[in-house]
Design a protein with these regions (language model features):
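Hydrophobic beta-strand segments
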Residues: 34, 40-46, 75, 116
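Short, acidic Ser/Thr/Gly-rich low-complexity loop/linker segments typical of extracellular
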Residues: 47-62
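A short, solvent-exposed loop/turn motif at the edges and junctions
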Residues: 48-50, 72, 76-89
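A short, Gly/Thr-enriched small/hydrophobic beta-strand-prone motif that recurs across taxa
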Residues: 19-29, 110-113
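Structured extracytoplasmic
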Residues: 115-272, 293-297, 331-354
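Short, flexible loop/turn segments at beta-strand junctions in immunoglobulin-like
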Residues: 65-67
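Conserved "repeat-terminator" motif of extracellular CCP/Sushi domains
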Residues: 91-94, 100-110, 114-118
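Structural motif
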Residues: 27-37
């Protein structure tokens, strides 16, 4: 019985939103200077606390949030390198409500300040847990800004995605050409990226199933491996079940590495990895992940041979995005590796949506 192993890199298409009569208009600026903060995430929640809309500020720091109904709303603003800000009790009637400028304070870190918190969330030695938790929150906020800017921003990122499949040749093919051991098939697609490029499951599903899920169809089993997204990486469940630590590559380096790994051995699929960020503002540079554990049914597969890398960049207008990514996994027949799949993508152009 054949089992296929594939790492999903699904990219979902977004839908355009119309402009109703009610809306909130505003501008996010840097406190003290008044400079516009582009690429900030603005979340609007209703009186019940549920998320109503999420938008990204433009190059001028402006935003317009269309609403389906009037009422009282609460705004939260997040941007890389800034402390989150809120605006309470924003009342909207049958009109566009224009707000005064919304200010965000800079949140800068110096290397000595950051490094003294290093040590990890699983050990006590020298770790200021309150400060470490604040840093983890900042890390998670930075990745969330990237994810939401891609999904809800005013920029369309066109990508080139190459899928390579490597598989072993048949015995007849080897007899005809003894030097031939592998076949490589490559497909190239061009499409917009409108979501986090590595597909994940909900936190509730990961709690039950892990990052490796077996599915059956027509008597044939296949395994699907999932990667992390910002919601998963910094969820209470992931923080409780994984160890986190920080280090600096060299004493003079301007970057920090946040490492994470399972707290204990897992009977389901689980991941480890690193997030590389700027030391001063915690802007993300790269996210690397790999499988640390796999289910017993995949005991013949090396977990570290499955994973991915995402590189981040900032476009001239200030929007942060995933610039390049690569994910890879083996292909199995039974419990033997017979090949592999690699998905490699990169942004080739960016244009305003309107």
């Amino acid at each position: 019985m054949s089992r296929r192993l594939a790492l999903l890199g699904a990219l979902l298409m977004g839908a355009a939103i119309g402009l109703p009569a009610q809306a909130i208009r505003g501008k996010v600026v840097e406190a003290g200077t008044g400079r516009p903060v582009s690429g900030a995430i603005v979340e609007v929640r209703g009186a019940d606390g549920y998320l109503t809309k999420r938008v990204v500020t433009s190059a001028t720091g402006g935003f317009l949030v269309p609403l389906s109904t009037g009422g009282r709303y609460r705004l939260t603003m997040r941007a890389i390198g800034f402390r989150p800000g809120t605006r309470e009790a924003v009342d909207v009637e049958l009109a566009v409500r224009t707000l005064p400028d919304l200010s965000l304070e800079r949140q800068l870190f110096t290397l000595p300040d950051v490094v003294k918190f290093a040590g990890g969330s699983c050990v006590n030695a020298g770790t200021d847990r309150t400060a470490f938790a604040e840093l983890l929150t900042a890390f998670g906020g930075a990745l969330t800004v990237v994810e939401q800017a891609v999904a809800h921003g005013e920029i369309t990122f066109e990508t080139q995605v190459i899928e390579r499949t490597v598989r072993g040749v048949t015995a007849r093919q080897r007899r005809a050409n003894p030097a031939r051991t592998l076949d490589t098939i490559a497909d190239t697609l061009h499409r917009p990226i409108t979501n986090w490029p590595v597909h994940s499951l909900s936190v509730d599903s990961l709690k039950r199933l892990g990052f490796a899920v077996e599915r059956w169809e027509d008597g044939q089993g296949s395994w699907t491996l999932y990667g992390p997204d910002p919601t998963v990486l910094f969820s209470p469940w992931f923080l409780e079940t994984h160890c986190f630590s920080m280090d600096r590559p060299t004493p003079s380096a301007d970057s920090l590495i946040l490492r994470f790994a399972p707290r204990r051995r897992s009977q389901v699929g689980d991941i480890a990895g690193e997030l590389v960020v700027n030391a001063t503002d915690l802007a993300p540079r790269q996210l690397r992940f790999r499988f640390a554990y796999l289910p017993a049914a995949l005991a013949g597969v090396t977990p570290g041979g499955i994973g991915g890398v995402l590189d981040f960049d900032r476009e001239p207008g200030g929007i942060w995005y995933v610039n390049r990514w690569r994910v890879w996994s083996p292909t199995l027949s039974g419990r033997q590796r017979v090949g592999g799949t690699e998905l490699e993508g990169r942004v080739v152009s960016a244009r305003p949506d309107r």
